């Protein structure tokens, strides 16, 4: 189906700016953000002082490399509001990513931040071919997860009609797509494939729907998956990138006319690529870990945040800003299961809270059709007074299954095993994860 390919008149001035204009704006905003963090966030004042740097030392964009990194652990160490740079009563909204019982990653937004977020998501939807008056079906989850509300406010900012469906209820999703006739769907790529499967099971030809564009994010997806979705649904499949700690969805987005990697909205987010082992800044085109510094966030500025995503920075094409290549992996052990970030250590903490279970476990990640599945195998504690009857194991499994869903936000199958059933590693690190999902 034809989509509305942007013309030069559709672009914001910053999307057409010269490199000199863009870099001058970035430096101005970077100086403000670094000083804002130093003067208002005790963590940053302490970290800058420990490294012997001061906001006055930032005289060029290259000088940012002198400043310390921020990691997810810093956010958790300052839970819940210790990273905020404004008084709590000035924070209009709080989101939180998945965490254990005590320490999710909390992010805050002022009203201006929410408007900025809506602006970059609106820009992302427009880059994907969306226009005012289009209907956008949002099947990202709503709530503490940033996906649903981030997409929602951006679509409204652009002037679109929003269908706030959220996730799940696949048959209902399809009914509304047929009845409301949306132009755009925003959803995880794996769930889109599930929707297409269900359409075909119901005898519905996906090519006959009103959908023209799918904006897919919250989990990595391959060019092969793009080709499959475009062929099966007759849509343009476009990649949106973001993370809660930096803003949410809308940090970067592909443009419909090129589909050659998400364009980073560099007027709000300054990217670097570093060697994940040494922290050295690498030249554009080199593969390494993606690092972001926010340039305009008021409530919670982040300086040199290590995303752990491995990618490359690519030169501009359809916009004046750089692009990022497809993410090839992560520099840590985080898994993304159906759009939810999960660390093996999170599961380990939940296991260790139950004295009837031993801290011997294995996470198995597979694909069931297009959906990620997680199976947790864990041993009974041999020192605990636990029976070996199947119903007792089943009760322990259900308890852990409930905890994983409640505190991490992902559904899992749990198998409780006899002591020593899980293979031990005698040399090197214990193998905690088996990821059988196909690689591109």
From Swiss-Prot:
Family: Belongs to the phenylacetyl-CoA ligase family.
GO BP annotations, alphabetical order: phenylacetate catabolic process
Biophysicochemical property: pH dependence: Optimum pH is between 8 and 8.5, with a dramatic drop of activity (55%) at pH 9. Less than 10% activity is observed a pH 6, and half the maximal activity is measured at pH 7.
Statement: the UniProt record of this protein carries the keyword ATP-binding: yes
Protein name per UniProt: Phenylacetate-coenzyme A ligase
GO terms, molecular function: ATP binding; phenylacetate-CoA ligase activity
Assigned keywords, A-Z: ATP-binding, Ligase, Nucleotide-binding
Activity regulation note: Inhibition of activity is observed in the presence of a 1 mM of the divalent cations zinc, copper, and nickel.
Role this protein plays: Catalyzes the activation of phenylacetic acid (PA) to phenylacetyl-CoA (PA-CoA). Involved in the phenylalanine metabolism.
Pathway noted in the entry: Aromatic compound metabolism; phenylacetate degradation
Pfam families, alphabetized: AMP-binding, AMP-binding_C_2
Subunit structure as annotated in this protein's UniProt entry: Monomer.
Induction entry: Induced by phenylacetate, phenylacetaldehyde, 3-hydroxyphenylacetate, phenylalanine, phenylbutyric acid, DL-phenyllactate, phenylpyruvate, or 4-phenylbutyrate.
Catalysis: reaction(s): 2-phenylacetate + ATP + CoA = phenylacetyl-CoA + AMP + diphosphate
Temperature dependence: Optimum temperature is 37 degrees Celsius. The enzyme is extremely labile, and the activity is totally lost within 48 h at 4 degrees Celsius.
